[in-house]
Amino acid sequence: MKTIAIDAMGGENAPKAIVDAVLKAKPKLKDTKFVLFGDEEKINELIPAEQKDRIDVIATSEVIIDSDEPVKAIRRKKNSSMVVAANYVKSGKADALFSLGNTGALLACGIFIIGRIKGVERPALMPTLPSAKSEDGFNIIDVGANAQSKPEYLVQWAQMANFYAQKIRNIKNPTVALLNNGAEDDKGDALHQEAYKLLKATDLNFIGNAEGNDLMEGKADVIVTDGFTGNATLKAIEGTASVILRLLKDSLLNNGLRPKVGALLAKPGLTALKKRFDTARYGGAVLLGVNAPVVKTHGRSNIRPIYYTLLQIDKMLSQDLVGEYKKYFSESR
């Protein structure tokens, strides 16, 4: 039986949204056990008596909040829901770690407590984002786990993302592109020029450089980038999408009868558009390169994205993604 350790106190809607998502996922994931860490009384009162099978609750007395400095927090708040859950995974009692809490602290838990895979230079954070070309979206790695990068790191990140796209997204031969400031192969600074050469020499389906305007068009299944650029890109995409949706809603609903009628007529198309750019169904961002799946979902998440993230984690465990990484990087050393 697979076991997922869950920080039940992370995020704005904890613990209710987390418990509700577990209860929703439980009938579908019949071979999975859920261990929730946090305020035992609050968590237990949300779980009906008839639903307590395959759900364990472990009491913790502290919570890492967003304003906490990540590394200091995991050292000082040793009885926090996130740290205790991470140690539970490290001990082998659980197979994966999931949290909606402080991103930096979760990355620190993954790297310093659960530990990186031998042969992996630097773990990296990777979400799946929507694209206009495909309902499958695209992966972008790294989006902030590393402030500084080397060309060799980008190659390993591309290799890990390639495995993920194959095993979890069911893409037989994923296309991989390097985020750069031009399409030509000599574009970019020394880091990107060397990364380009190294990626081209691998057996990946590397299609060259991708510019910022290519991402949402779906030029590649996997986009590899340094952590600084990736983080800025992710926030720009999220912010732009949020503003466009807000402006669209405001223009349709707050400008009289005619736009409202138009919105009603356009509803099927708008529904399809909303579905295409619905990030919840992709699950959370994954810290790749550590000894167990470590997955982060946005702190504002409600039941739906949490539910899909639980399905995502379960598939990662079923496909033994970490085992594939360990085998690959041990053989390539």
Swiss-Prot record:
Keyword Lipid biosynthesis applies: yes
Coiled coil: none
Entry GO terms, CC: cytoplasm
A Gene Ontology molecular function term of the record: phosphate:acyl-[acyl carrier protein] acyltransferase activity
Subcellular location(s) of the protein: Cytoplasm
SUPFAM superfamilies assigned to the protein according to its UniProt record, in alphabetical order: Isocitrate/Isopropylmalate dehydrogenase-like
Reactions that this protein is recorded to catalyse: a fatty acyl-[ACP] + phosphate = an acyl phosphate + holo-[ACP]
EC number: 2.3.1.274
Classification via Gene3D superfamilies: Isopropylmalate Dehydrogenase (3.40.718.10)
Pathway: Lipid metabolism; phospholipid metabolism
Chief place where the protein resides: cytoplasm
Pfam families assigned to the protein according to its UniProt record, in alphabetical order: FA_synthesis (PF02504)
Any GO BP annotation: fatty acid biosynthetic process
Keywords linked to the UniProt accession: Cytoplasm, Lipid biosynthesis, Lipid metabolism, Phospholipid biosynthesis, Phospholipid metabolism, Transferase
Keyword Transferase: yes
Top-level taxon of origin: Bacteria
Assembly mode: Homodimer. Probably interacts with PlsY.
Family per record: Belongs to the PlsX family.
Role this protein plays: Catalyzes the reversible formation of acyl-phosphate (acyl-PO(4)) from acyl-[acyl-carrier-protein] (acyl-ACP). This enzyme utilizes acyl-ACP as fatty acyl donor, but not acyl-CoA.
UniProt-listed PANTHER family: FATTY ACID/PHOSPHOLIPID SYNTHESIS PROTEIN PLSX, PHOSPHATE ACYLTRANSFERASE
Protein name (Swiss-Prot/TrEMBL): Phosphate acyltransferase
Organism: Lactobacillus johnsonii (strain CNCM I-12250 / La1 / NCC 533)
The gene coding this protein: plsX
